[in-house]
A protein has these predicted regions:
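Active-site-adjacent substrate-binding region
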Residues: 100-126
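Soluble non-cytosolic domains of exported or imported proteins
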Residues: 9-17, 53-60, 98-103, 158-169
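Active-site histidine-acidic residue metal-binding/catalytic motifs
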Residues: 1-62
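Active-site-adjacent mobile loop/cap segments within catalytic or ligand-binding domains
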Residues: 76, 83, 122-184
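Sec-exported extracytoplasmic/periplasmic mature domains
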Residues: 20-31, 38, 67-71, 79, ...
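Structural recognition of the beta-strand scaffold that forms the well-ordered cores
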Residues: 32-37, 73-77, 91-94, 141-145
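A short, glycine/acidic-enriched catalytic loop
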Residues: 1-9, 80-107
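Mature extracellular/periplasmic domains of secretome proteins
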Residues: 56-71, 131-136
């Protein structure tokens, strides 16, 4: 289920809200989008019985969706949590397997920092094996940690619908900037 904020709100609830808003904006830009989930249910195979089998199946299905078209870009929305509650800010992780992943990550990070978080000094980071989908991706793939649910002030923002919309717009703007570099 991911991180849980001190007020009890689960990361997955915030993730889905931002992802819905991002999906809406990207479709308005005329892009074809596919969401790996549209509700609070895992996408694991029905024959996966144990929690471990369900998680593995879920990851493999997401990987299959990501790899289904060579023109796909994969953007995973998440929230961060850390024991130090003063940490804040969006940070984008990218797949080590394609140079385009770093370019996309940079476009999104710069967009969020310039449009929404002017004081954010975080930089993009190459994924390690701990982020399975990015580490094994053959397509352009990034994971956007939108903020820290462990920071009370940032968590309030992350739970706010208007802030979620602005976050989604900032991410979408970065994606469009990336796409425009590919069209040149």
């Amino acid at each position: 289920g991911g991180a849980v904020a001190s007020d009890g709100i689960s990361e997955k609830v915030i993730n889905l809200e931002i992802a819905y808003k991002l999906n809406y904006i990207l479709r308005a830009y005329g892009l074809n989008t596919v969401m790996t989930r549209t509700d609070d249910e895992s996408i694991h195979d029905s024959n996966a019985k144990t929690l471990r089998e369900q998680k593995v199946s879920d990851i493999h299905k997401r990987m299959s969706i990501m790899e289904s078209d060579e023109n796909n870009i994969f953007v995973s929305i998440h929230q961060n949590k850390f024991s130090n509650s003063s940490l804040w800010g969006t940070q984008v992780f990218y797949s080590p397997n394609t140079t385009d992943s770093a370019v996309l990550a940079n476009c999104i990070q710069n967009s969020v920092c310039s449009l929404l978080q002017n004081d954010n000094k975080r930089v993009i980071k190459k994924s390690g094996s701990n982020i399975y989908l990015l580490y094994y991706a053959k397509r352009t793939a990034v994971l956007v940690e939108c903020g820290f649910v462990s920071n009370p002030q940032e968590n309030k923002l992350l739970e706010n619908s208007d802030y979620q919309r602005r976050m989604a717009f900032s991410i979408a703007f970065g994606i469009m900037e990336y796409i425009n570099t590919k069209d040149v």
